[in-house]
């Protein structure tokens, strides 16, 4: 840790401590300090965990609340200081002229140069380029805007403090530092007196607003900037023939993901699409208002194009002071039309005033873009390139990036639900009596007949369906209305989770056809929506390529693909595959599935686009996005990658413009490098694949023996983690299980991983790997040879390196001494001790095998920055865990008072903040 960062954390911690003493009293402050110092002693090995348990022995729920809040705030401020420090280190490296680090565009340009990548290859990749971060909801990401605002202001004041500390001191330096400290104290006081989390269970609408907040915080500005910068750079390096298309195209699941969530309805689809459009239209209006003030250029000073004059004359801005200012008059008219568009699409209440009513709304984003390009062209013709390259160029890039939709809203539902809906529709329409009971061949015949027929299934005005079917139909109906209003980019994807057959993929196409998103035309249907199978269990991942191969033999579907640019998108589920088969088996099943899909697409002449359903944690496919994309098989990226972003990962990546820029750059850099360069140094691919397959089977066997076969495991899991509390408290809008059952299979991936991370076991991110590696390596001379093989793979193959590195990262955040406290909550002591012993033994075996393969002495030897980060936040985590265990004990004994419930939520959110990737 650098002196600056240590100083910042101590500085912010001191102020927080003083605020706590002032607001809560000396007794609370002293208990916080005692817990903090004890935690540091434990971290240094100078005390046992029991000493912290003793600190909180007998603590009342009322006294526990400010302690939980204190350590949650410590974690929040430590994150803030760390982010600022990382940002400043990068700035210093740039100032020093250091070699650009990996995951930056500057580094990517150098690599493309060194790799002698030609313009034709770049152009080919960019024609279908799409880098799509897709924001999804998460139960612990419930921070309020007030908290974000406070963080933003504290960061601003800390930057001011650093600038003063780095500058030559003057007579006023100390007084300025005192003023900054006063401002920070004020903000921390406001933060302390603000509720960190909402009282009520968040509604879908609340989660939509949280997602939109990141656009206002960073993405509205940074996505257009990075798209503009990439386009300009590639044109300069590779020539005018390189297509200028926006690369980053954001998406969202919030409001459209109805898989297992009955609260997603037609109303949430309408709300999500309308609020997205309103957000981007108001952004355009603000930018145009600023441009109108900035572009004071007089036509007495320079010439303008006839097209610009025509636009100015249509601007209805004939005040005398602007008679010689055609740009202002032109922009005024464009702004009027955008406001008129907002009033038409969103409603007149969304726009202040009436002056815009003389203007005609834009019919499309393309019409708006043409007007902006008219202004741009005129500026460039008169040698005002510097002016054109500023705000106007960002606005043009924004229009190309966002249209009138801002993001693309995905619809997602599981295959079983689609089958249920069609069973009811087909029965009512007298197509077939019981579709669900038909064979696969019979279902296929029914579906193809319906897809070829323009006849609607639903009689006009009919509403006599079951509640579930009516809700599903309402979602598709509203999606169709949103597309008509905001354009085809508003809802361009329909995802089928748990897809395991050809008919699973075709079923939602019937519903899309019913509401006009697909038009029947014999074997040549036309549509604006990609139908995307999601393969997520180990079995389905293995079968995925075979399913697509059969699907592509159907002329109707193959022709539909052709009019969708011949692109087949496939979503890969990291979460359920991990829950199904464990960390290593899931990772290999995903990689192997990609190998098969790449080969299938190559032989069939179909373009592949992969959508990676990654969570925040390693157990759900998390880890650095840059490394994850580079770890894909050759041919799996091809300029396009979609990837889910959620929870604390969203706030960590996109909570401010600097981190947003960095993370968007990482996605684009990795996509370009994976598409255009050979990043793997494997010499014998088949041998590497055979090794992974063998280790995967051994890992699956170990994982299955505990998670799916041990009779006591379900009791251990449900009773030693906060799973019950996640289900019963107001944490997230989505139920924690798909069905009312206690099986691991039906449990949702987020509560599965979130529960293990809260109890500090982190089991989904490593269990089974140690045994698998030890058994595969064996003993004696064979062991020496096989260790060498694995060491070579770790040095030469990004996939294997990424698997090990991500595992080490998550294991470094585990703390089995705390896990033992959670295990003590289990009434059946035999189950508790037996399962804990299995977990404990496997953890240390996995750590040992990791060190053998990597040649390390500890988990994070190769990542000192992350190691220091984990060490810094460790002491803030311990008190939160100990308090959580005590509150869970009370809750389960019947004390389900608001104070106890609130403390459990506080500790869950505090731990999520400190861990930064909880579920």
Swiss-Prot record:
GO terms for biological process: carbon fixation; oxaloacetate metabolic process; tricarboxylic acid cycle. InterPro entries: PEP_COase, PEP_COase_bac/pln-type, PEP_COase_Lys_AS, PEPCASE_His_AS, Pyrv/PenolPyrv_kinase-like_dom. Its cofactor is Mg(2+). One of its GO terms (molecular function) is magnesium ion binding. Its EC number is 4.1.1.31. It catalyses: oxaloacetate + phosphate = phosphoenolpyruvate + hydrogencarbonate. It is an enzyme of class 4 (lyase). The active site is at 138, 579. Transmembrane segments: none annotated. GO terms for cellular component: cytosol. Keywords: Carbon dioxide fixation, Lyase, Magnesium. Forms oxaloacetate, a four-carbon dicarboxylic acid source for the tricarboxylic acid cycle. Belongs to the PEPCase type 1 family. This is Phosphoenolpyruvate carboxylase. It comes from Corynebacterium glutamicum (Brevibacterium saccharolyticum). The gene is ppc.
């Amino acid at each position: 840790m650098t002196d600056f960062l240590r100083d910042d954390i101590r500085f912010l911690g001191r102020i927080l401590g003083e605020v706590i003493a002032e607001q809560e009293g000396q007794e609370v402050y002293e208990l916080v300090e005692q817990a903090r110092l004890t935690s540091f002693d434990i971290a240094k090995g100078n005390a046992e965990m029991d000493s912290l348990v003793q600190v909180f022995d007998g603590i009342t729920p009322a006294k526990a609340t400010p302690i939980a809040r204190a350590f949650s705030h410590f974690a929040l401020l430590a994150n803030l200081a760390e982010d600022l420090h990382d940002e400043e280190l990068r700035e210093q490296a740039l100032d020093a002229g250091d070699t650009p680090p990996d995951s930056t565009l500057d580094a990517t340009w150098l690599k493309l140069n060194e790799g002698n990548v030609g313009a034709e290859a770049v152009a080919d990749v960019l024609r279908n380029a799409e880098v799509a971060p897709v924001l999804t909801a998460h139960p612990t990401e419930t921070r309020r805007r007030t908290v974000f605002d406070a963080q933003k202001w504290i960061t601003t004041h800390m930057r001011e403090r650093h600038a003063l500390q780095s500058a030559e001191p003057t007579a006023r330096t100390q007084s300025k530092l005192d003023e900054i400290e006063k401002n920070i104290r004020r903000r921390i006081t406001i933060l302390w007196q603000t509720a960190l989390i909402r009282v009520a269970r968040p509604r879908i609408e609340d989660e939509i607003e949280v997602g939109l907040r990141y656009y206002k915080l960073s993405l509205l500005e940074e996505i257009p900037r990075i798209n503009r910068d990439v386009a300009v750079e590639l044109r300069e390096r590779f020539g005018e023939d390189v297509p200028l298309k926006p690369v980053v195209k954001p998406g969202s699941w919030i409001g459209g993901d109805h898989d297992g969530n009955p609260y997603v309805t037609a109303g949430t689809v309408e709300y999500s699409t309308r609020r997205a459009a309103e957000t981007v239209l108001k952004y355009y209006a603000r930018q145009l208002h600023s441009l109108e003030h900035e572009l004071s250029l007089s036509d007495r000073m320079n010439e303008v194009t006839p097209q610009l004059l025509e636009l100015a004359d249509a601007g209805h801005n004939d005040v005398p002071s602007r008679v010689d200012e055609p740009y202002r008059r032109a922009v005024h008219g464009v702004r009027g039309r955008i406001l008129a568009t907002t009033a038409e699409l969103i409603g007149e209440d969304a726009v202040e005033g009436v002056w815009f009513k003389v203007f005609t709304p834009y019919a499309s984003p393309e019409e708006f873009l043409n007007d902006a390009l008219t202004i741009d062209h005129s500026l460039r013709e008169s040698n005002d390139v510097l002016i054109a390259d500023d705000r106007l160029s960002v606005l043009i890039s924004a229009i190309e990036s966002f249209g009138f939709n801002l993001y693309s809203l995905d619809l997602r539902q599981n295959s079983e639900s689609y089958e249920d809906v069609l069973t009811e529709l087909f029965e009512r329409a007298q197509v077939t009596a019981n579709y669900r009971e038909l064979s696969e061949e019979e279902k296929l015949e029914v579906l193809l007949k319906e897809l070829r027929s323009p006849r609607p299934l639903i009689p006009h005005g009919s509403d006599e369906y079951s509640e579930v079917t009516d809700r599903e139909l309402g979602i598709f109906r509203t999606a169709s209305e949103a597309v008509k209003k905001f354009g085809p980019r508003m809802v361009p994807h329909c995802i089928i989770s748990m897809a395991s057959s050809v008919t699973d993929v075709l079923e939602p196409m019937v519903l899309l056809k019913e509401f006009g998103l697909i038009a029947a035309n014999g074997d040549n249907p036309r549509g604006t929506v990609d139908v995307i199978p999601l393969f997520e269990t180990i079995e389905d991942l293995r079968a995925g390529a075979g399913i697509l191969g059969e699907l592509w033999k159907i002329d109707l579907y193959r022709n539909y693909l052709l009019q969708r640019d011949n692109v087949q998108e496939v979503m890969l589920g990291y979460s359920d595959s991990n829950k199904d088969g464990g960390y290593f088996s899931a990772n290999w099943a995903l990689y192997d599935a990609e190998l098969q899909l790449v080969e299938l697409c190559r032989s069939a002449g179909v373009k592949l686009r992969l959508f990676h359903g990654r969570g925040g944690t390693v157990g759900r496919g998390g880890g650095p996005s840059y490394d994850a994309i580079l770890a894909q098989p050759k041919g799996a990226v091809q300029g396009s990658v979609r990837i889910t972003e959620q929870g604390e990962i969203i706030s960590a990546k996109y909570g401010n413009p600097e981190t947003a820029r960095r993370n968007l750059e990482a996605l684009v850099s990795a996509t370009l490098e994976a598409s255009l360069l050979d990043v793997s140094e494997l010499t014998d691919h088949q041998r590497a694949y055979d090794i992974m397959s063998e280790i995967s089977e051994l890992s699956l066997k170990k994982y299955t023996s505990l998670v799916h076969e041990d009779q006591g495991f379900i009791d251990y899991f449900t009773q030693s983690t906060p799973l019950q509390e996640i289900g019963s408290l107001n944490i997230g809008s989505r139920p924690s299980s798909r069905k009312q059952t206690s099986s691991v299979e039906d449990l949702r991936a987020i509560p599965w991983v979130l529960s293990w991370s809260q109890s500090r076991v982190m089991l989904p991110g490593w269990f089974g790997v140690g045994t698998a590696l030890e058994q595969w390596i064996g003993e004696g001379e064979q062991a020496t040879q096989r260790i060498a093989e694995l060491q070579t793979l770790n040095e030469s193959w990004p996939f294997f390196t990424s698997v090990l590195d991500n595992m080490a990262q998550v294991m470094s955040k585990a703390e089995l001494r705390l896990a033992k406290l959670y295990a003590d909550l289990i009434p059946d002591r035999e189950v508790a001790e037996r399962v804990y012993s299995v977990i404990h033994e496997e953890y240390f075996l996995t750590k040992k095998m990791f060190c053998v393969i990597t040649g390390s002495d500890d988990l994070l030897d190769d990542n000192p920055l992350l190691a220091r980060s984990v060490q810094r936040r460790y002491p803030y985590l311990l008190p939160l865990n100990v308090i959580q265990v005590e509150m869970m004990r009370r809750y389960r004994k019947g004390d389900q008072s608001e104070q106890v419930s609130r403390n459990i939520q506080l500790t869950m959110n505090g731990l999520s903040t400190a861990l930064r990737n909880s579920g």
